[in-house]
Amino acid sequence: MSYVKLTDCEELVMKCVWDAGKDLSLVETMALLKDNYGKNWKRQTISTFLLHLIQKGFLTSYRVGRVFYYHQEIDLESFRRQQTEDFL
């Protein structure tokens, strides 16, 4: 996969997904952002970041009942390795 740059906010959302170690819903992501990083972003703002991350290939989503869950497609180690290769 070619390197895709993340914004600081997108990277923060990905950190929540990576730290959780499981698929997250929007509500779970909101709670982690608030509890771990002090970000009290609105639901639509986080939804937009999640959509951008899907478009960039970092996440996929699936639906269970009425809830969408977000699954990481790129792990933290792969992301960091690609950042390092880009830097060098």
Model-derived regions, located:
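A short, conserved structural fragment
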Residues: 54-64
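Short, positively charged loop/turn segments that connect secondary-structure elements
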Residues: 34-46
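Short, hydrophobic-biased segments on the C-terminal half of alpha helices
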Residues: 47-51
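A short, structured beta-strand/loop element
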Residues: 85-87
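Short acidic, hydrophobic short linear motifs in intrinsically disordered regions
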Residues: 23-33
